[in-house]
A protein has these predicted regions:
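Active-site cofactor/substrate anionic-group-binding motifs, chiefly glycine-
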Residues: 37-38, 42-90
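Anion-binding alpha/beta catalytic cores of soluble intermediary-metabolism enzymes, centered on
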Residues: 92-164, 259
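Short, structured coil segments at secondary-structure junctions
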Residues: 60, 90, 110-112, 168, ...
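Adenosine-phosphate binding glycine-rich loop
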Residues: 254-255, 261-306
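Positively charged, low-complexity intrinsically disordered leader regions
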Residues: 1-51, 55, 123
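Rossmann-like adenosine-cofactor binding region
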Residues: 192-272
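Glycine-rich phosphate/diphosphate-binding loop of Rossmann-like nucleotide-binding domains
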Residues: 43-56, 140-219
Length: 306
C-alpha cells in the first residue's frame, strides 16, 4: 500500500503530478472523495496542518475525525500496531503528527488505510509539497528547476527540502551553524538522487554564500516543538543566521521568502523582511489545503489500483 511518510518514497513524476493537481483543485474545487473518512491523530499542537487536512477532506465531500493523543489508548500504553489495526480498518485515510517518526512507520506497517506524515521529528513532507506549489505559482521554477537557499536548523524541514531538491533536480544551498549536522543517511540518499536528477546541492555555514543567485529563500524556527528547554542555547548558536534586509539583498532581486510558520520575528527572520514577503508566506500556508486535497485523491486512486 502506498503511504506518504516521506518524499523519498515518491518519484519526480509523482511529486510534480501532486503539485499540478493541487493547482487544478485550487482553480476548480471538486467533490472527489464523497463519504470518505480521514482520521487525524495529533501528538503535537497544530494550526495550519489541522485546518488544511480537515478542510481538504470536507471540501472533497468526506469527513474528518480528530483524535488527540489523550483521546486514544496509546496514551495508556496500547501498542501502536493494535491502534493501527483498529483505526486503519475503519477509515479511508490516517493522518498523523507525531513526536517520533518510528511511530508512523509502525502504524503504517499494520494499517489497512494509507498513512500520511503531517510532521515528525525527521520529515515534514506535506509542508514541502505546499512550498513547491507556491514556488510554481510565483513563477520561480525555470524549466522545471528552482534555485533554493535553506537557512536554519538541520530539522524536519531541512531534511524534507534536501530530499525534494535531490529528487526534482533543483539547486539547493543549505547554511547552518558549524555544530549542526544533517543525518548521514539522509545526506547519502540525497547525494545518490542528485547523481540521477542532476541536482546541485551544497552545505555550508555562511548564509550569504548560500543566498547568492537564489530565487527562493526558506527559513524555519530555530526552536522546534519539544525543544523549548534548549531555546536560550539555540538562539545563541544561530546568531547571525537571521534573514534580514542585508541577507535578502544577496539573493536574486525578485527572490521570494518562504516560512512554514509560526515565525518568530527578530530571530530567524526580521520583522521588516517578514512583512515584505507576507503575501507569499500566507499564500504558502493556504496552499497546504490544495496539496493535501491532491494527496488524498492520489492515495485514494492508488488504493483503487490494488
Amino acid at each position: 500500500m502506498k503511504h506518504f511518510l516521506t518524499l523519498r518514497d515518491f518519484s519526480k513524476e509523482e511529486i510534480l503530478s501532486l503539485v499540478n493537481h493541487a493547482s487544478e483543485l485550487k482553480k476548480e474545487p471538486k467533490k472527489l472523495l464523497q463519504d470518505k473518512t480521514l482520521a487525524m491523530i495529533f501528538e503535537k499542537n497544530s494550526t495550519r496542518t489541522r485546518m488544511a487536512f480537515e478542510l481538504a477532506i470536507t471540501e472533497l465531500g468526506g469527513k474528518a475525525l480528530f483524535l488527540s493523543s489523550n483521546d486514544l489508548q496509546l496514551s495508556r500504553g496500547e501498542p501502536v500496531k493494535d491502534t493501527a489495526r483498529v483505526i486503519g480498518a475503519m477509515v479511508d485515510f490516517v493522518m498523523m503528527r507525531v513526536n517520533k517518526h518510528e511511530t508512523l512507520l509502525e502504524f503504517a506497517r499494520y494499517s489497512k488505510a494509507p498513512v500520511i506524515n503531517a510532521l515528525s521529528e525527521l520529515y515534514h513532507p506535506t509542508q514541502v509539497l505546499g512550498d513547491l506549489f507556491t514556488i510554481k505559482e510565483w513563477n520561480k521554477m525555470q524549466n522545471g528547476i528552482a534555485k533554493v537557499a535553506f537557512i536554519g536548523d538541520s530539522n524536519n524541514m531541512c531534511n524534507s527540502w534536501l530530499i525534494a531538491a535531490a529528487i526534482l533536480g533543483f539547486e539547493i544551498s543549505i547554511a547552518m551553524p558549524k555544530n549542526y549536522k544533517i543525518s548521514p543517511e539522509i545526506w547519502e540518499f540525497a547525494m545518490k538522487q542528485a547523481l540521477i536528477s542532476g541536482a546541485k546541492i551544497s552545505l555550508g555555514h555562511d548564509k550569504f554564500e548560500a543566498l547568492k543567485d537564489k530565487d527562493v529563500v526558506i527559513t524555519d524556527t530555530w526552536v522546534s516543538m519539544g525543544e523549548e528547554n534548549e531555546k536560550e542555547r539555540k538562539i545563541k548558536e544561530f546568531e547571525g543566521f537571521m534573514i534580514d534586509e542585508k541577507a535578502m539583498s544577496v539573493a536574486n532581486k525578485d527572490a521570494i521568502l518562504l516560512h512554514c510558520l509560526p515565525a518568530y520575528r527578530g530571530y530567524e527572520v526580521s520583522e521588516e523582511i517578514f512583512e515584505k514577503h507576507a503575501d507569499v508566506i500566507f499564500e504558502e500556508a493556504r496552499n497546504r489545503l490544495y496539496v493535501v486535497k491532491a494527496l488524498l485523491c492520489f492515495l485514494d486512486n492508488q488504493k483503487g489500483r490494488e
